[in-house]
Amino acid sequence: MPQIIEAGLSAQGKKFGIIAARFNDFITERLVGGALDALTRSGAADGDITLLKVPGAFEIPLAAKKMAMTGKFDAIICLGAVIRGATNHYDYVCAEVSKGIACVSLDHGLPVMFGILTTESIEQAIERAGTKAGNKGFDTALAAIEMANLMTVMGEA
């Protein structure tokens, strides 16, 4: 039987950074609320959570890199909403933000979680920010907690 390594969902004693885009703030504020709810329900203290606001999703990877470089965080949660418009702008932003977040995570060996909604419409974004399709900010924070704990477990294995 293979060795199975899993981690729990306790945020107690862990430090979390949240980076949230202000663009489409009527969506991102709901994502932030969901993330904060997940973290506090899981035992994170208010003093263990840092919220950083950036202008838009495109700025998130640089902010995540700077946050990761401090060495103060066990996980970083990136939240934003990119909604398709009439031009190619959506495609470029989505591609670069996802690559940038992945690079920060790999370069720093740190869970940097992708909680960026990439939707075809405002309605889809609203659904994923706390209505029909749950709250992806909450889901992303739970994944961040699990990954932060997994990094600890793997460091001890």
From Swiss-Prot:
One of its GO terms (molecular function) is 6,7-dimethyl-8-ribityllumazine synthase activity. Its EC number is 2.5.1.78. Pathway: Cofactor biosynthesis; riboflavin biosynthesis; riboflavin from 2-hydroxy-3-oxobutyl phosphate and 5-amino-6-(D-ribitylamino)uracil: step 1/2. One of its GO terms (biological process) is riboflavin biosynthetic process. It catalyses: (2S)-2-hydroxy-3-oxobutyl phosphate + 5-amino-6-(D-ribitylamino)uracil = 6,7-dimethyl-8-(1-D-ribityl)lumazine + phosphate + 2 H2O + H(+). Coiled coil: none annotated. The keyword Transcription does not apply. Pfam families: DMRL_synthase. InterPro entries: LS, LS/RS, LS/RS_sf. SUPFAM superfamilies: Lumazine synthase. 5-amino-6-(D-ribitylamino)uracil binds at F23, A57, F58, E59, A81, V82, I83, F114. Gene3D superfamilies: Lumazine/riboflavin synthase. The active site is at H89. GO terms for cellular component: cytosol; riboflavin synthase complex. (2S)-2-hydroxy-3-oxobutyl phosphate binds at A86, T87, R128. It is an enzyme of class 2 (transferase). The keyword Transferase applies. Catalyzes the formation of 6,7-dimethyl-8-ribityllumazine by condensation of 5-amino-6-(D-ribitylamino)uracil with 3,4-dihydroxy-2-butanone 4-phosphate. This is the penultimate step in the biosynthesis of riboflavin. NCBIfam families: lumazine-synth, PRK00061.1-4. Belongs to the DMRL synthase family. PANTHER family: 6,7-DIMETHYL-8-RIBITYLLUMAZINE SYNTHASE, 6,7-DIMETHYL-8-RIBITYLLUMAZINE SYNTHASE DMRL SYNTHASE LUMAZINE SYNTHASE. This is 6,7-dimethyl-8-ribityllumazine synthase. It comes from Desulforapulum autotrophicum (strain ATCC 43914 / DSM 3382 / VKM B-1955 / HRM2) (Desulfobacterium autotrophicum). The gene is ribH.
